């Protein structure tokens, strides 16, 4: 049995692709559904987490074959908001990484990893992720991968971004380049908390799309 744990639109597209190509595929879309389904898992099942936001109890990941997709070149950029943190930090290359889940966040053995450029808007980036995700799932379910440990010496961890961190202040405009600010705006497009500036009346002006002079 294959279980796909996903709820974001782009992740549901991946579920559809898997459903078309494999038998016995099931979808779990919420934490409540996951909790209610645990008793149905068996040791031979593959449980894949794609764009999943909820913490899975250690007892579950140690008992079952739980595999997670993380959009970063693990062991770098473990933790929350990986795409946003990479783009805001000026990274130009990321990766789709599938790893075996353990009790430690994003630290399990890597099963599959492929690089992709962090260019374009979030729609462009998510399209690349979707394409690579299906390739990774196809390889993993067909046992076409080489498992290896993560290099802890190369690891980095970032916290999930909060809506308040999306602000672009006057100081930011003076300090950062047009490309820097463009990166912040493009990585915070819907459905994420958009970049914004606070105007003289105290209201927020949201910046959903931007371009800059090359």
Feature annotation, model-predicted:
Residues 1-214:
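One-carbon transfer enzymes
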């Amino acid at each position: 049995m294959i279980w796909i744990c996903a709820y974001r639109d782009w992740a549901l597209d991946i579920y559809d692709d898997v459903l078309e190509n494999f038998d016995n595929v099931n979808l779990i879309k919420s934490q409540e559904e996951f909790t209610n389904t645990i008793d149905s898992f068996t040791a031979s099942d593959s449980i894949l987490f794609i764009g999943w936001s909820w913490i899975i109890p250690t007892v579950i990941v140690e008992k079952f074959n739980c595999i997670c997709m993380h959009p970063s070149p693990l062991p770098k950029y473990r933790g929350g908001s990986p795409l946003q943190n990479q783009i805001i930090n000026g990274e130009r290359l990321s990766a789709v990484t599938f790893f075996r889940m353990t009790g430690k966040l994003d630290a399990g053995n890597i099963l599959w990893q492929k690089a992709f450029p962090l260019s374009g808007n979030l729609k462009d980036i998510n399209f690349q992720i979707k394409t690579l995700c299906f390739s990774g799932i196809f390889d993993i379910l067909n046992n076409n991968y080489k498992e290896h440990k993560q290099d802890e010496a190369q690891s980095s961890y970032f916290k999930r971004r909060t809506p308040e961190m999306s602000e672009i202040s006057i100081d930011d405009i003076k300090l950062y380049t047009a490309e820097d600010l463009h990166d912040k705006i493009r990585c915070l497009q819907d459905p994420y908390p958009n970049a914004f500036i606070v105007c003289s009346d105290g209201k927020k002006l949201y910046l959903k799309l931007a371009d800059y002079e090359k």
